[in-house]
A protein has these predicted regions:
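Short, hinge-like loop/turn segments at secondary-structure boundaries
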Residues: 56-60, 111-112
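Structural beta-alpha unit
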Residues: 1-7, 20, 34, 80-114, ...
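General small-molecule cofactor/ligand-binding pocket signal
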Residues: 40-42, 92-96, 145
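A short acidic, glycine-rich active-site loop
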Residues: 59-74
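Aromatic/hydrophobic pocket-lining residues that form π-stacking "cages" and hydrophobic walls in ligand
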Residues: 24, 28, 104, 136
Length: 152
């Protein structure tokens, strides 16, 4: 067996529940099937900003566990909606704390490809990528593919 360079075959896909991210998951799984690679479906979660009479209120440690569990549950549901319970390639899911762009760039280190969705708006606005996709295209440590959602 020939050793493959680090990252060969690992495809990271950003998932936020949108139609375009579901399309990105579908594309990543098809590509992984063809290249005999694996997919790492990643979502980001952050603490909501709580403000009280005395200003910003820090979250409790129980909030952290609940927020991460909810993000992972939503990620798993979205992946299953996109490719079913038994996809054609291995899909690993991970919910990470941080901003979407930051989480995706960190996850993409050593990956063969980063796949993200774009909410393409059509017309002039459609020429612009979403801010997360744009940031990833400009700063990713690997090639990036931006997938548009189905037009409807």
């Amino acid at each position: 067996m020939v050793d493959q360079p680090e990252g060969t075959g690992r495809i990271v896909v950003g998932v936020d529940g949108s139609d375009s991210s579901k399309q990105a998951v579908r594309w990543a799984v098809r590509q992984a099937e063809v290249t005999h690679g694996g997919v790492e479906a990643v979502t980001a979660w952050e603490f909501p900003q709580f403000h009280g009479a005395l200003g910003w209120l820090p979250p409790s440690s129980s909030d952290e566990g609940a927020l991460k569990a909810r993000a992972l549950q939503e990620l798993t549901r979205t992946v299953e909606e996109a490719v079913g319970p038994r996809p054609a390639a291995q899909v690993r899911t991970e919910a990470r704390y941080g901003t979407p762009a930051g989480v995706l760039l960190h996850a993409a280190e050593g990956a063969a490809l980063l796949v993200v969705g774009s909410r393409g708006l059509g017309g002039f606005a459609g020429l612009l990528l979403g801010s997360v996709a744009q940031h990833c295209v400009q700063h990713a440590p690997c090639p990036v593919l931006v997938v548009r959602g189905e037009e409807g």
